[in-house]
Amino acid sequence: DKLTNESEITVLTTEEEVVDALSEGDKGTVIVDETVFYATMGGQEGDKGVIKTSEGEFTVETTIKLKGGKIGHVGTMTKGMMKVGDTATMEVSPAYRADTCKNHSATHLLQKALRTVLGDHVEQKGSYVDPDRLRFDFTHFQSMTKEEIAKVEDIVNEKIAEAIPVVTDVMTIEEAKKTGAMALFGEKYGEKVRVVAMGDF
């Protein structure tokens, strides 16, 4: 995945209003034509990073999806100034993205391990993922025993230790079902789907 791109600034806001420019110390939102930043969605926190222009630097503290599908980069103008129409260099924090991706992958390992230990009735009902932690909500009909928790933990840790490559492929929904791919909670799928595999997980 790309971590940098150049794009034109199309909209700037402070916390109260749409503006033509942001100056050092201003808190606000930057909207550009195209971005490499992932927005907060599906329980996963959005990217952090910086947006640079020839005259200033904006620290992105979170990234959100706005009405109409645009992406908002929320943060603080930390140096100089920037204005609508400027060309900006978008830079995602590589460490933040990598750690978030690792925890996102861990939710998939956890789901498979839970289904292996508890049964196929286990389904994801929600999750939260950021670089430091994850939470995974799932269906089950009783509290897990200490032994079940230990088994699930062992399976996930074994798979992490194996350093299994993550392989992605795009295929039709029918082809995905034939491979045994699991659909995720709350997702709506089009004709083509992205399938992620980690070994036999």
What are the language-model segments listed below?
Residues 1-201:
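A glycine- and charged-residue-rich anion-binding loop/surface
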